[in-house]
């Protein structure tokens, strides 16, 4: 993933309509508060050799995606060595263990001055990838596109298991890891009991530090979800709950950020639709939710913020999460929240003032939580929720914490 400035320098575009906003916040927090020389290396499409460009405050290295970063790619090791020799870093901060380029750096340059920030953990996520779907449902909904690309929900889950092996190897090799939840702490130490765990919260994109949700300005009975891209986001399960909610609130509306995986209105939808999209179509039709679900397409930070403030409720129905930034963003703005009780999410919702939590499997409980929250939202006092979130995502505080971690590791 390229940060906005890096993308602009490479191809003239700068919108960030994907995950990774925490890295923008972390970089700006460090640069705004400390005199440091910062470089960021990312894989990029459309190039066939290593490229270096200088931004206003950051040096960027673009590594060709080549054969891809979901498998061991020996080319990455030589690129990492070249970058390391050119920039001569005091410390290398690897963001995320989901892809192979972090392991490539450690293999090429060693682990003595490297630290990993845990984002999600594919080695753990893999078992939850298709959670809530039966084998027969998955097989029955294999599409033409799945057959052509030889990529089904089962193979996607298998891909998580394979990438998880590289993640485990990386964590076993490292001496330091940065996390922020009891879940990533437990799973990091389960892999490497000798690794030193450093706690540091994440800084969000600047757009979410201003404005506050107001009941009088929201669209009543409207739910916002940040993604339905993959089964791991749990949208297939949420649809079951929405079917129950609709009996009580007929005008319930669910708006979803990200690409429309159903491709129901796409002229070539039949040939391009993934199996998961077909499953969602099947459920939407089964529960007669065609007029209750709206896919918004990819959104940048300002557009996401608009949808949070517009919604009556934010729901995170994932099968597994560590600390979803979408929950943090919603809380920062004071939006009523419901999330599944999974992974590290419970650390983000310590009390009912900050949101409600429901087990992923409890479809009826989720439906009742949605109905009750919508009915009670007129009287919702979001001051505690906002206060807790702003303390957690305080940019200055998190920059100081991260800088001190860097100094501790270097010394």
Q: Across the structure, where does each feature detected by a protein language model lie?
A:
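Conserved donor-binding/catalytic core segment of Leloir-type glycosyltransferases
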Residues: 214-233, 239-246, 254-257
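N-terminal subdomain of nucleotide-sugar transferases
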Residues: 1-47, 56-58, 397-400, 407
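Nucleotide-activated donor-binding/catalytic signature segment of Leloir-type glycosyltransferases, i.e.
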Residues: 268-298
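Short alpha-helical donor nucleotide-sugar binding micro-motif in glycosyltransferases
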Residues: 84, 298, 306-311
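Short hydrophobic beta-strand element within catalytic cores of glycosyltransferases
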Residues: 336-339
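Conserved acidic donor-binding segment of nucleotide-sugar-dependent glycosyltransferases
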Residues: 351-352, 356-363, 372-378
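A charged, aromatic-enriched C-terminal amphipathic alpha-helix characteristic of glycosyltransferases
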Residues: 71, 378-411
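Aromatic "clamp/platform" in nucleotide-sugar-dependent glycosyltransferases that forms part
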Residues: 319
């Amino acid at each position: 993933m390229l940060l906005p400035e890096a993308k602009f320098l490479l191809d003239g575009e700068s919108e960030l309509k994907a995950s990774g906003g925490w890295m923008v916040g972390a970089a700006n927090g460090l640069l705004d508060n400390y005199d440091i020389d910062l470089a960021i290396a990312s894989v990029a499409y459309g190039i066939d050799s290593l490229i270096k460009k200088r931004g206003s405050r950051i040096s960027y290295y673009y590594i060709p995606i080549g054969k891809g970063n979901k498998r061991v790619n020996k080319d990455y090791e030589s690129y990492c060595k070249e970058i390391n020799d050119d920039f001569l870093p005091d410390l290398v901060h690897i963001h995320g263990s989901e892809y192979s380029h972090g392991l490539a750096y450690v293999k090429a340059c060693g682990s003595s001055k490297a630290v990993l920030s845990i984002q999600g953990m594919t080695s753990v996520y893999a078992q939850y990838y298709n959670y809530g779907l039966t084998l027969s449902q998955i097989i029955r909904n294999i599409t033409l596109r799945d057959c052509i690309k030889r990529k089904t929900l089962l193979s996607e889950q298998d891909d998580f298991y394979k990438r998880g092996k590289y993640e485990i190897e990386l964590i076993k090799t490292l001496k330091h890891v940065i996390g922020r939840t009891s879940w990533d702490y437990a799973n990091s130490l389960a892999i490497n009991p000798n690794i030193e765990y450093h706690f540091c919260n994440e800084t969000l994109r600047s757009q979410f530090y201003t404005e506050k949700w107001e009941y009088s300005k929201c669209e009543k009975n409207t739910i916002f979800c940040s993604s339905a891209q993959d089964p791991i986001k749990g949208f297939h399960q949420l649809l079951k709950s929405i079917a129950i909610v609709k009996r009580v609130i007929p005008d319930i509306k669910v708006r979803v950020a990200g690409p429309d995986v159903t491709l129901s209105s796409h002229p070539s939808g039949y040939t391009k639709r993934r199996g998961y999209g077909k499953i969602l179509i099947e459920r939407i039709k089964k529960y007669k939710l065609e007029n209750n679900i709206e896919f918004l397409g990819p959104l940048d930070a300002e557009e996401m913020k608009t949808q949070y403030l517009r919604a009556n409720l934010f729901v995170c129905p994932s099968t597994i999460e560590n600390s979803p930034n979408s929950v943090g963003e919603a809380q920062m703005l004071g939006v009523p929240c419901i999330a599944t009780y999974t992974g590290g999410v419970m650390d983000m919702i310590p009390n009912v003032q900050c949101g409600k939590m429901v087990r992923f499997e409890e479809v009826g409980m989720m439906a009742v939580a949605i109905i009750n929250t919508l009915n009670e939202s007129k009287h919702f006092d979001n001051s505690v929720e906002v206060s807790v979130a702003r303390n957690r995502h305080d940019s200055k505080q998190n920059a100081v914490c991260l800088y001190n971690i860097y100094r501790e590791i270097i010394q």
